[in-house]
Amino acid sequence: MTTPHSIAESTDPEVFPANNRHLTVSYASRYPEYTRIPAITLKGQWLEDAGFTTGTQVDVRVMNGCIVLTAQQPQPEESELMQSLRQVSKLSARKQKQVQAFIDVMAGSK
């Protein structure tokens, strides 16, 4: 006989039926051969409601019979100082030393 601890409890589904969408795989033509390739089009206000606003980058994970789309978090903007440092790192070693000497003078360290 089964003990009470080994009986699975009923849980709510992670995705509610109202949030389900039904699509049909269509096709797109590939130029210049005009071969048909499978295509899925997603559109609707529900995408924005789900966190997929226009311009959002999306990670796509593909498994057999399953595609998972995940909205990427926007990258924080790089500060002006970090942008300048990135530019300096592309300069020649001589120019980098000149920039370092300037920073040292401004900081009063040398």
UniProtKB/Swiss-Prot annotation:
One of its GO terms (biological process) is RNA metabolic process. One of its GO terms (molecular function) is RNA endonuclease activity. PROSITE patterns: SPOVT_ABRB. It is found in: Cytoplasm. The keyword RNA-binding applies. It is an enzyme of class 3 (hydrolase). Coiled coil: none annotated. This is Endoribonuclease SymE. It comes from Salmonella paratyphi C (strain RKS4594). The gene is symE.
